[in-house]
Amino acid sequence: MWKLASIVLATAAVCAAADPDLTGIWSPSRATGPGAPAPPTPIVVKPAYKATFDGLTAKIREASARGEQYATKGLCSPYGMPTMLQVAVYPMEVLQSPQQVTLIGEAFSEVRRIYMGKKQLPLDDIAPGYYGHSVGLWDGDTLVVDTIGIKESVQGYSNLPHSDQMHITERIRRVSADRLDDQVTIEDPVTLEKPVVYTLVYRLLKDYQMVEFVCDNNREYIDENNIVRMKMGSQK
């Protein structure tokens, strides 16, 4: 009897100490009413970047009003961080182990790795890339992720300009069985007057299987005005 009780208590202790489980396939969603996250903070860029940012924002809005898509990246280029975190309706799969949390975006089959329990590398030791270098640790039920080393050509959140000094901090938490929140803070001492903070909300897709997404550049092209067009049957 006492032996059984000891086993039960030991098992309970292990379970209590286990890291929160973020695994699953998560679809971008919205939360309204009670429990909804705070709205995004305004984007305030430094004067040297304001004209470029405002001009690009205007072109995107004008194209959208015409029902068109203004190209902000190459057709087959990945979105990279932080845009890959929420691309239209495309879901994201989270795989988790004690050593690494892996995020797989269905759009462009993007893969991002978060190395757990590691110290962040010096920026000079990181080869700039689409996803940068991410390290994570647990703060209670929240995964705190630190990311640097994203190259300047990568599309930014809401197309904000960024330098190689951009620093992204995330606080990822499973709010309920079927909801995941990711609070994102973007800092850049070169391009931003103040940090940009926003929260992404995801819903669990219980019976979904990720679909292969390969960009072969056969259906679309970018015209001379930077608008994404569909190729006609006779075009190559």
What positions do the PLM features span?
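PEST-like low-complexity, intrinsically disordered acidic/proline/serine-rich tracts
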Residues: 17-236
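Hydrophobic h-region of N-terminal signal peptides that target proteins for export
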Residues: 8-17
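Bacterial N-terminal signal peptides that target proteins for export
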Residues: 1-7
